[in-house]
Amino acid sequence: MHRRHVLFATIAVLAASGMVRAGLWQMRRLAERRAFNAVLSARLDSVAVPPDRLPPDTARLRYRRVRVDGVYDTAHELVLVGRTRNGSPGVNLVTPLRRPGTDTAILVNRGWVYSGNAKDVESLPRWRASSATNDSGFADVFPMGQPGPIEIPGAAAAIRRLDIGALGGRFPYPLAPYYIVLFGDTTAKLDSTPARLGMPKLSEGSHQSYVVQWFSFAGIALLGTVLYIRNDLRRMRGADAIGGADTGP
């Protein structure tokens, strides 16, 4: 082998090694996603419980089914802006739920309504509900560590995201360390009920296709290099043979 063949082979092996590592990483991500899906499926298939029976550990309560009853505090309702549904702009309505026997309120995402600018809602009071009676939902945890303000200038009730640290001062009572997303009819009623957000989707994402892609790239890099070197050596031997014939007696 010539020096350039060694160089090409070295580059191909290094590139293939990187591609194999990327494929193995995608395999680990696929295994993690499948494990998460198994937990998610089990929790969504479980029997709905009242909030008082949720696990105290927020990591264990996520996506557990909940049955909610209580009175909505519409005076402190929030409008979660920038939410799309089937390509249409809109908002989510998030309302504190007060329950008997406790001072702690739970924020409840009651669903999506249309908003042309994904911020302002025409006739907002029409979408309000005074109470929840045996409504079904699932618990979720507040996202953490997202930078930037949550307030929208000029819109007192509008927020960019649910951030319990930033929201605490808005309410005259403590908030639960989780919120509830109602599910059910995903079609907004024209009278007063927002479209529910629906159950979380089980998906493995694109990890499996990426595994095949990276391993295929690694194989192509190695095989292509072998074929190139073999053909180049064959060409060189042919050239040597012709040169030898030309210099013969």
Regions of interest found by a model, annotated:
Residues 1-59, 63-249:
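Surface-exposed, charge/polar-rich loops and edge strands
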